[in-house]
Amino acid sequence: MKKYLTSFLIFSATSAAIAHAPADSVAIQTGIDGAENEKDIPKEPGTATVASEQDYFDFLRILHAEQPKKSGHLLGRLARSSKDLGEHKISEYDTYLKIYFPNAHSDHVQRFMIESFVDQEKWDEAELALLKFVYLYPNSALKKTVIENGYVLLEEEDYYQSDRDKLVTLLQEAPRSGEIQNRYFKFLSAVHGLRDPKLKPLFKREAWEYLRLYSHLPRASKALMGLAGVDLSNGAHHSALMIYEKLMTMYPTSREFASALFQSGKLKQEQFGEYNEATANFRQFLKQFPEHRFVAEAQYRIAAIADQNFNDWTTAIGEYEKVVTQHPTNVYTITSLLRVGEIQATKLRQEEEAIATYNRIASEYPDSTVQVTKALQRAGKLYEKSKEYEEAIAQYMVVHEKYPGTEGALVSLEKCAVIYEKKIKRKDKAVEKLNIIVKEYPGTKKAKKAAKRIKKLNK
């Protein structure tokens, strides 16, 4: 680390000769009433002198060279002075950049940022400042030295160990041309792509700055989606919702509108209990974006709200059926049918319809072993409840026949044995099923239990 700090100090001294060079994409800085140089602005007698950009930058060079002052009054005063000075430097640099970015001496001030964060050992901030320099000032005369010092920093500081290779790649592959707004967005994408939790608040700060500068550009909606995503991951659901609302209001023709509409519905459903509003969002989503990859989930959520929140069973069944008929191969399809069968059996007391629904799952989705097993066992249980024991056994045995050797088949065989022994009073049939367990599941606890049961029944 000492080597890196020394290199930056040397760089600070030797770069003074080029400190007046323009930044990348330099433009003439105009002052009041369009004057090209603030010094050309006529002054009224007795009025204060208007500071120029050069004056401001000259002060920042002095500030950057300033070191914490020692004090003999109180122990710890030096440490506080160091912290206060470091924070003050960053505030001044940030103020300058808000006024003059990306022109004038912005690249020099961005370099000051990097060095100040290193001095303060704020490694996350130094990382961000380094990436920002490389992405935003590709034509700067300072770039080569900044990158070289950056490599030293990444190599010597343990903080960067886990992401070192990624960061080196980003430094090497940063865009070398293109409009500043495009490079800024690529910088945001690079930071977001690191997936570093420590960078989340810094990403948010930079995304808001991007929006301050470029809210009129198409990619602003993407920046808003990134901000909302960070808020969601932090549990800041209300602010995320407001960001989605802002996106839909300000960028109604953007590609991100669909995702914002869908995510708004999810938040209203899951976090705020606004079920009517959520349903309205999902219906609007289905109407406007019928080919979107989230349409099946949106339809499923409409059904789930009618089911779980409004207890409107008939409507819920109808909405679940839309999932099944419109999206027959989706992940929500079998789940919807299972819930339809459950509603029919437990809410509407339509046992026959429920059994038919469960058998429909078995016939239409035979490759879904776990869910088909669940459906057939539910059907068997309904037959047991109505004392139709032979039919119940038939349902359970389908599981064994279709999915032999599975846990579901084992449970189904046990159920058959119990019915034969306890309900139908056919010990021979019970022994027959128990023998299958012993044969097909050797060495298991269930097999040992079945063997003991066989001995007892054969007495």
Residue ranges, per PLM feature:
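Sec-dependent N-terminal signal peptides
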Residues: 4-13
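Hydrophobic alpha-helical membrane-insertion segments, chiefly the h-region
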Residues: 14-18
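Acidic, polar-rich low-complexity tracts and alpha-helical solenoid repeat scaffolds
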Residues: 19-459
